[in-house]
């Protein structure tokens, strides 16, 4: 669920297996632009723009007096928190189901981690999802929250909000559509 893998076959020079030279040449040709700074500069620009969009959204929501609780104290999510300079001023706390994390704080951003049950009792205006790669599971688990007026914010892969008006469509589309 949290990664990928490569399948590699190696053989000696006297092996009956022959490498697919056409495929190898095509891969090397396709990867040629990666030897320049262009793709990396474009990626960097997109990351900066996206992190500014996330930060602005959270600042705007907080300026309106709304409550925001993070959802899922994950390593990937913590990278987003630190890159976007998100701290307890923007996200009051983070809900997680792992009891070993409760009462601890996120590295760098210093946001306290609480049980999901406590988050549900607090009824925040927004949940900011830090485990976006579990898109369907989050929506399924928090359907009642959404149907009672809560809003779920996914910052990645693109910033979007799920509410009771678009819940069914977003659930049907799934993570891959973003």
Positions of predicted regions on the chain:
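Flexible, glycine-/basic-rich loop-and-beta segments that form/coincide
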Residues: 2-46
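A short, well-structured juxtamembrane/interface segment
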Residues: 46-64
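Glycine-rich adenosine-cofactor-binding loop
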Residues: 61-82
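Substrate-recognition/cap helix-loop segment adjacent to the acidic, metal-dependent catalytic center
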Residues: 79-92
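Short internal beta-strands
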Residues: 92-97, 153-155
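Conserved nucleotide-cofactor-binding alpha/beta core module
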Residues: 99-105, 117-118
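Phosphate-bearing ligand-interacting subdomains
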Residues: 110-172, 176-177
């Amino acid at each position: 669920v949290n990664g990928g893998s490569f399948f590699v076959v190696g053989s000696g020079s006297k092996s009956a297996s022959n490498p697919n030279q056409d495929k190898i040449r095509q891969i090397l040709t396709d990867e040629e632009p990666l030897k320049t700074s262009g793709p990396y500069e474009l990626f960097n620009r997109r990351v900066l723009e996206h992190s500014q969009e996330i930060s602005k959204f959270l600042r705007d929501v907080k300026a309106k007096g709304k409550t925001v609780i993070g959802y899922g104290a994950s390593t990937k999510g913590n990278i987003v928190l630190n890159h976007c300079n998100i701290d307890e001023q923007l996200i009051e706390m983070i809900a997680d189901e792992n009891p070993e994390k409760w009462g601890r704080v996120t590295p760098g951003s210093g946001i306290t981690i609480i049980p999901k049950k406590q988050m549900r009792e607090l009824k925040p205006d927004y949940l900011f999802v830090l485990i976006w790669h579990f898109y369907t599971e989050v929506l399924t688990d928090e359907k009642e929250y959404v149907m009672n007026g809560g809003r779920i914010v996914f910052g990645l892969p693109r910033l979007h909000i799920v509410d009771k008006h678009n819940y069914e469509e977003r659930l049907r589309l799934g993570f891959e559509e973003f």
